[in-house]
A protein has these predicted regions:
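Enzymes that bind and transform nitrogen-containing heteroaromatic metabolites
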Residues: 1-168
Length: 168
């Protein structure tokens, strides 16, 4: 039984921190990956996702991104002049058949999705570990809401369930 989406969206920044720019090539998976990146992935990082993913879609506004020098049949590039998540998701659906996608990113990208009201379901896993500091990213980073009138900029979702995982 499939328990996860077959499309995963991540940021190049987080993936670079996880070491994809220096990792050896992985085995192919049935999951397709979308990476939003302007300058964090190098050629090895791009090839890593070409090896890993059924389909690899890079979204970038960088005309000199290393992905443009890679020739792999499963590599697709969406070039944007500026970030438009709504347009990118529409293109993922129309051009690549992406109906559902899991977004696993940092607070800055999460903030953009939230402010464009593009979340329709959220799974939050909270690990029993406390990490902090004023420079530590949070679940939603980005520009702060400054007034009550700005609450309309974010969507409200209904809590469906709260489940404690084993060994947590």
């Amino acid at each position: 039984m499939q328990t996860t989406d077959l499309w995963s969206l991540n940021s190049g920044r987080v993936q670079a921190k996880l070491g994809v720019n220096t990792k050896e090539m992985p085995d192919k998976t049935p999951v397709s990956f979308v990476i939003i990146d302007n300058d964090h992935l190098n050629k090895n990082g791009v090839l890593y996702f070409c090896s890993l993913a059924k389909e690899f879609v890079l979204i970038t506004s960088n005309a000199n991104h290393p992905a443009f020098d890679v020739d792999e049949s499963n590599l697709h590039i969406i070039r944007q002049n500026g970030p438009s998540l709504k347009e990118a998701l529409a293109e993922l659906k129309s051009e690549y058949g992406c109906e559902r996608i899991t977004i696993q990113s940092g607070g800055t990208l999460n903030s953009l999705f939230l402010h464009e009201k593009l979340f329709d379901y959220i799974d939050i896993v909270i690990a029993p570990v406390l990490i902090g500091g004023k420079d530590t990213p949070t679940l939603i980073d980005g520009k702060s809401l400054l007034s009550e009138s700005e609450l309309s900029k974010i969507g409200v979702l209904k809590l469906q369930e709260c489940m404690v995982l084993k060994k947590s």
